[in-house]
A protein has these predicted regions:
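Short, conserved catalytic/metal-binding motifs centered on acidic residues
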Residues: 13-24, 59, 97-106, 121, ...
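An anionic, glycine-rich sequence signature occurring as long contiguous blocks
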Residues: 120-207
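Domain-level cores of phosphate- or acyl-group-handling catalytic modules
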Residues: 71-130
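Electropositive, glycine- and tryptophan-enriched low-complexity nucleic-acid-binding patches
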Residues: 37-92, 193
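Active-site-proximal, Lys/Arg-enriched surface segment
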Residues: 1-52
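Short acidic, glycine/serine/threonine-rich loops at helix termini
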Residues: 27-33, 38, 62-66, 108-114, ...
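Glycine-rich, histidine-containing beta strand-loop boundary motifs that form or position
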Residues: 19-21, 52, 63-66, 101, ...
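Flexible loop/turn segments at secondary-structure boundaries
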Residues: 24-26, 60, 70-73, 104-109, ...
Length: 207
C-alpha cells in the first residue's frame, strides 16, 4: 500500500505538505501521556499529541509521529518535516514543494530551516499588537466580492529581518455576527488571519 501511495505521489508535478497536531485522549496510565497543548482539549485529561502530515491535494498520508500530550506542536517539528520532505519523490523539485502549517508552528527557527533548505512555506501568524497595526495599515485589493487581500513586509520581535506576510479581510456587513465573534474587527472590517510566507504568489493565491 505504501509503495502504491508513493507511486501516486510520483505523478505529481508539485506537492503541498500539510502538518498538524491533534489530541488523542487516553484512560489509565499509558506511557508517554500527559495533559496537552491542544487548546480545545487542554486540562481535560491525559493524552497523546500525534503529529500528522499529508499531501494537501491528494490527502495521501506522508507520515506521523506519536508524541506525549504535553509536547508543543513546534517542538521537534523540523526534524519531523525534514524526514517527510526527504521521502517525497525526487521527480518533485524542491522549488515545487510547499508546506502549510497553522499558528502552532509559527516560530523563527522553523521558518529559517525552510528558507535555508529552499522549501516554500505558508504559516499562520500569531497575532500580536504590532502585527495587527501593520496589517491594518496595509494596502488591500478586492479579489472576490466582499473579500480583500494584502501583502506586506514585517519584522516580528527578535526575528532580526523582514518577512513577507499576507492578510485577508472582509467588510463587517458581509460577515455573520457569529463569525465576527471569533475574529477581530477594525474600522468596519473583519480580519480573518495573517500568514508569513516566502511564496512568490498573489496574496489571494497564498490564502
Amino acid at each position: 500500500f505504501r509503495a502504491v501511495m508513493m507511486k501516486l505521489l510520483g505523478l505529481l508535478y508539485s506537492a503541498i505538505v500539510d502538518a498538524d497536531t491533534t489530541a488523542l485522549m487516553t484512560h489509565g496510565h499509558q506511557e508517554g501521556v500527559a495533559k496537552g497543548y491542544v487548546p480545545k482539549r487542554r486540562h481535560r485529561g491525559p493524552s497523546y499529541a500525534p503529529l500528522f502530515s499529508s499531501e494537501g491535494r491528494t490527502g495521501i498520508s506522508l507520515g506521523a509521529e506519536l508524541r506525549a500530550g504535553n509536547v508543543h506542536s513546534s517542538t521537534g517539528a523540523w526534524d519531523f518535516l525534514k524526514l517527510i520532505l526527504s521521502k517525497l519523490p525526487s521527480t518533485i523539485a524542491t522549488s515545487r514543494i510547499r508546506t502549510r502549517l497553522d499558528g502552532a508552528f509559527y516560530n523563527k527557527e522553523l521558518i529559517n530551516c525552510f528558507e535555508k533548505e529552499g522549501f516554500g512555506y505558508v504559516i499562520v501568524a500569531r497575532m500580536t499588537d504590532p502585527l495587527k497595526r501593520t496589517m491594518y495599515s496595509a494596502r488591500y485589493h478586492e479579489f472576490a466580492r466582499g473579500w480583500e487581500a494584502a501583502s506586506f513586509t514585517y519584522t516580528p520581535f527578535h526575528w532580526n529581518k523582514e518577512y513577507r506576510f499576507v492578510a485577508v479581510r472582509r467588510p463587517q456587513k458581509f460577515e455573520p455576527e457569529e463569525v465576527q465573534r471569533h475574529l477581530f474587527t477594525f474600522k468596519h472590517y473583519t480580519y480573518h488571519r495573517a500568514m508569513v510566507t516566502n511564496l512568490e504568489l498573489t496574496p489571494e493565491a497564498v490564502w
